């Protein structure tokens, strides 16, 4: 039985970062979360999170970013995670150059909380528009 992750190259215990491209299909929300979980699991072997909640917050933020990329920026997206001095830098690059627009939450319509949730979870959030899309950068505690 192979111990290689499902999403690509195996990560070493000393992995400082991981970058994974996705085609932008519905199943990629789960795949992005699994890729992040694999990276964080490997990272935790050498540097455990200060709180178990930090891992869960990062996974939730990755899921929300991936879902937003699929819904609002049709096409491929790239997920990157990198260890920083005191946390994790998450980047999602997608094909839509427009910055996210927060929506009001409507219980009957669903949705509307993802961007607010991302901003609440992260210590810092920035959006970097480009000619071919944008990058959303999050810094979360670890």
Predicted ranges, named:
Residues 61, 66-71:
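Short, well-structured hydrophobic secondary-structure segments
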Residues 34, 39-63:
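Conserved short strand/loop->alpha-helix "switch" segment adjacent to the catalytic nucleotide/phosphoryl-transfer site
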Residues 27, 49, 53-56, 60, ...:
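Residues at secondary-structure transition points
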């Amino acid at each position: 039985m192979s111990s290689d992750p499902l999403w690509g190259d195996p990560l070493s215990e000393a992995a400082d970062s991981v970058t994974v491209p996705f085609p932008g299909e519905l199943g990629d929300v789960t795949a992005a979360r699994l890729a992040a979980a694999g990276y964080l699991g490997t990272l935790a072997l050498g540097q455990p999170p200060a709180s178990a909640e930090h891992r869960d917050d990062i996974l939730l933020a990755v899921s929300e970013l991936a879902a937003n990329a699929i819904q609002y920026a049709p096409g491929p997206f790239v997920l990157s995670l990198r260890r920083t001095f005191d946390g994790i830098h998450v980047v999602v690059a997608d094909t839509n150059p427009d910055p996210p627009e927060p929506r009001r939450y409507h219980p009957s319509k669903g949705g509307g909380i993802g961007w607010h949730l991302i901003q609440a979870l992260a210590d810092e959030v920035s959006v970097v528009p480009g000619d071919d899309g944008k990058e959303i950068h999050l810094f979360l505690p670890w």
